[in-house]
Amino acid sequence: FINPSIKDIKLSKMLDTDCVEIHTGKISNLIKSKKNYINELNRIKNSSVLANKYNIEVHAGHGLDYKTTKILNKIKEIQEFNIGHFIIGEAVFIGLSKVIKNFKKIIRN
């Protein structure tokens, strides 16, 4: 994980990294607590754009669920979402197949 910051993306470039996973815990907590998350969303967007410019593949993860993934999916530079914990937890209640179908709908839109 790296923080969604220009500094961390530049350091990743200096280290010749080909892929980063942006930590989305802060935005996930802000969204879940119904607080303003726009500044954090902009940090993630700006970091993702710069990483893409540097040809660094961008992944995102930590605290993701349906709502947070739908919001972050608007950032086209993010190529992968790591949502394992929520998927398994939700599958206990509605089944793995249904959870996967729900996420496919979110990501395809």
Which sequence ranges carry the predicted segments?
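Electropositive phosphate-/nucleotide-binding environments in soluble metabolic enzymes
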Residues: I6, L41, Y66, F93-S97
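Glycine-rich phosphate-binding active-site loops on the catalytic face of alpha/beta enzymes
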Residues: C19-I31, E77-L96
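Glycine- and other small-residue-rich loops at beta-strand/loop junctions that grip anionic moieties
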Residues: F1, E40, G61-H62, V92
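Histidine/lysine/aspartate-rich catalytic loop segments that bind and position anionic ligands
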Residues: F1-L50
